[in-house]
Amino acid sequence: MKQYRKDSFIDAGSLPALKPILRSWIDVQLAYEHAMGHDDRAWSYRERTCVGFLSAAAWQCGGVTLEEWRTEKGPKKQTRHGRCDLYICRRNQEFFIEAKHMYSRATGRSERELTYIARQLDRAVGDASVLQCERSTQLGVLFVAPYYPAGKHPDSFDEHISEWLQGVATVPHSAMAWLYQPRHKLHGEQAMHISPGIVLLARTPK
């Protein structure tokens, strides 16, 4: 499908309130890359930094956030103290977010890699489900950074990334977005490790 060939894409799915935040999430990452002279990219980093860029995106589009804040988790009779990765409030819509980050070997066995991705998103959703807030405001988020190991570059990054994205889209989710370097510009020696972009998957608990 055509959308898998796009270098950036947003599908807010069942979470329309997330759409402007996801659009801003793409914008702030592009702004960072531009400020760094295209020598560094937001998706080069792990969970904590990825959460920070999502937080920045919410502020950029008129929301407010809290990061890594102390809260209570679990059933009220078995409350325990913990931390929530990110709270977003925008136009009276709240999201209490627990996030995970992972690298996915884009050239690995598709079935195995998709199982890993689904498992990590399940973990994020599970963590969100024990937050003491309304069920509809709980949100698990997974940041997935695909990578191509040295010596494993495809003949066509465009084709390969499109196929990889189609696979990732089969993982059950409520919303999805991604950002990639322009694929026609992707190149490098086979000895280089390449991480060309990032995917965000979000899902609410059942």
Spell out what each predicted region is.
Residues W59-T79, D85-C89:
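A short acidic/basic microdomain associated with nuclease active sites
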